[in-house]
């Protein structure tokens, strides 16, 4: 008669996914978010916006010109702005803020890009999720008023400008696809973006007054 028994290893790690990272470099999150943001601006948003504004002529071969309003691309741009851009930048900010010492330039770069993405999203769609968005804590974030979103973007830029150290590059520098860690250029960009948003808010107020 033969008897067999089975048992688990004493220190079994079967509940630990070996393919899932438990820590991440904020520089990689930043480069991933910036790449996706640029891709969305060039590929996902260019052609539908250009066609709707009659900047492009498709010759009748594009679906939009045939009144075939497929939401795939537009919804993709909306969703991926939050999942691929805002979410990754939020995580990068959290990691940079908890590092010792706090990497202020990294936080500033992430917040500037985040303000850029939120401003673009709001100027395209109006009221959007902002205060509760991309935190990983709220499944159905509320929609904030467009004016509140743009004001929040300005506040985000002011916070970032106050953190910039032009003499330091920080941990994101090797993965900075825009300015290679040159914080003086990031400061110029943040100020230019702030001016652009302020002009947009002024125009929005004029439109609201005009239409009553």
Question: PLM features: what roles do these ranges have?
Answer:
Residues 61-173:
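Conserved, well-structured interaction surfaces
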Residues 39-43, 117-127, 204-206:
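Secretory-pathway/luminal and periplasmic proteins that interact with or process carbohydrate-rich
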Residues 1-7:
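Sec-dependent bacterial lipoprotein signal peptides
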Residues 8-64, 68-72, 80-83, 87, ...:
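Membrane-proximal, proline-rich intrinsically disordered regions
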Residues 8-11, 46, 151-170, 183-212:
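Aromatic-residue-lined binding/catalytic grooves and analogous aromatic/hydrophobic interfacial grooves
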């Amino acid at each position: 008669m033969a008897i067999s028994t089975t048992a688990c290893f004493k220190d079994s790690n079967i509940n630990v996914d070996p393919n899932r990272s438990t820590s991440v470099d904020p520089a990689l999150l930043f480069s991933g978010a910036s790449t996706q943001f640029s891709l969305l601006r060039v590929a996902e948003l260019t052609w539908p916006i250009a066609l709707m504004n009659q900047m492009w002529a498709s010759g009748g071969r594009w679906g939009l010109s045939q009144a075939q309003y497929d939401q795939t691309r537009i919804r993709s741009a909306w969703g991926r702005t939050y999942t691929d851009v805002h979410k990754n930048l939020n995580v990068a900010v959290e990691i940079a803020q908890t590092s010792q010492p706090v990497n202020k330039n990294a936080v500033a770069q992430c917040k500037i890009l985040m303000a850029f993405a939120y401003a673009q999203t709001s100027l395209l769609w109006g009221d959007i999720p902002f205060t509760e968005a991309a935190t990983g804590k709220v499944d159905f974030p509320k929609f904030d008023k467009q004016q509140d979103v743009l004001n929040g973007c300005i506040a985000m830029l002011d916070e970032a400008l106050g953190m910039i150290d032009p003499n330091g590059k920080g941990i994101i520098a090797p993965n900075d696809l825009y300015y290679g860690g040159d914080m003086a250029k990031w400061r110029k960009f943040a100020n230019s973006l702030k001016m652009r948003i302020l002009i947009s808010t002024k125009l929005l107020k004029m439109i609201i007054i005009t239409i009553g």
